[in-house]
Amino acid sequence: MKHLHRFFSSDASGGIILIIAAVLAMIMANSGATSGWYHDFLETPVQLRVGTLEINKNMLLWINDALMAVFFLLVGLEVKRELMQGSLASLRQAAFPVIAAIGGMIVPALLYLAFNYADPITREGWAIPAATDIAFALGVLALLGSRVPLALKIFLMALAIIDDLGAIIIIALFYTNDLSMASLGVAAVAIAVLVVLNLCGVRRTGVYILVGVVLWTAVLKSGVHATLAGVIVGFFIPLKEKHGRSPAKRLEHVLHPWVAYLILPLFAFANAGVSLQGVTLEGLTSILPLGIIAGLLIGKPLGISLFCWLALRLKLAHLPEGTTYQQIMAVGILCGIGFTMSIFIASLAFGSVDPELINWAKLGILVGSISSAVIGYSWLRVRLRPSV
């Protein structure tokens, strides 16, 4: 029990469980004995009916639309905390990770488009390599233990949070279906209620969650991706402490183990089951997977390193204390671990087009993410001396 407690207390535990879930999905999707069960599980219909309201989706969509909204609620809480009290609270603190994140989104997207611009269908996946899996990246960094400078961990977390915020904006602007104005109206009313609750100093988290459920349902029915409701709710839950208690921090503390050990692993299990049947080297080097691999493995570190170098040269920002530019470059490689976030965007980009495209996109994401994890970890292991 002591070893189990130590495992779940470590920063690396969430990343390790994600890896196990993804590997299990790959095995089950490619085994004759389990592939049928795996796909049947994902296609299991689940219906929710409240009065005249009816939501009917399969298990995969419930995981992607409902459970991932909880993940984005946690992201919203983390972004708010960092903006108001943490590593993004001042312009001087925020400048370096913000500039790094911008480079880490622009260059991978451009590199992907260099491969896919001529194809109007695969071109829609331009945002896939722009994402970073914060849990996976921090998990890999945690494997290096105490030799990692605290400032480097904070830099990676801040960069990944800004990256997540960028991904949220991209999803809202570019990956929406036909809009229902009536549902958007209900969503607007729900947001107005959240504003009033916050301004009136309401500190009961349950009230915000209840309004959040209404908001999630309205956003789901509107055509905008429902997970955005989670971020919005997270932004309005009060962060300020009163009598030593902060509703936002308390909810963040409660949600973190559920997200790290259930929601993200379940998402990985549901989405990483890529069938390798018919996969050839020729297929793997086709424009879609190759663009994703290049974006994650080359575009991410190149964009982050280049923009950081420019920021330093132009004196727009400074290196985090106790870190080196080579360590920043290695962190840039770790940010090429797109995994769950990239898979999520791929499902939005190609979900209504062709399941085969999603399969090839997932394969590119897995190759690019695993390569980034191995190379980034190896580089940092060489660059960082064990603490004595």
UniProtKB/Swiss-Prot annotation:
Could you tell me the keywords of this UniProt record?
Antiport, Cell inner membrane, Cell membrane, Ion transport, Membrane, Sodium, Sodium transport, Transmembrane, Transmembrane helix, Transport
Q: Which Pfam families match?
A: Na_H_antiport_1
Q: Which GO terms describe its molecular function?
A: sodium:proton antiporter activity
The places in or outside the cell where this protein is found are: Cell inner membrane
- Main site of residence? membrane
Q: Which reaction equation describes what this protein catalyses? A: Na(+)(in) + 2 H(+)(out) = Na(+)(out) + 2 H(+)(in)
Residue ranges, Cytoplasmic compartment? 1-11, 81-96, 131-154, 201-204, 237-253, 311-339, 381-388
Q: Which GO terms describe its cellular component?
A: plasma membrane
Superkingdom of the source? Bacteria
Gene Ontology BP terms: regulation of pH
Q: Which residues cross the membrane?
A: 12-31, 59-80, 97-116, 123-130, 155-176, 181-200, 205-222, 224-236, 254-272, 287-310, 340-350, 358-380
Write out the topological domains of type Periplasmic: 32-58, 117-122, 177-180, 223, 273-286, 351-357
Family to which the UniProt record says this protein belongs: Belongs to the NhaA Na(+)/H(+) (TC 2.A.33) antiporter family.
Functional note: Na(+)/H(+) antiporter that extrudes sodium in exchange for external protons.
Protein name from the UniProt record: Na(+)/H(+) antiporter NhaA
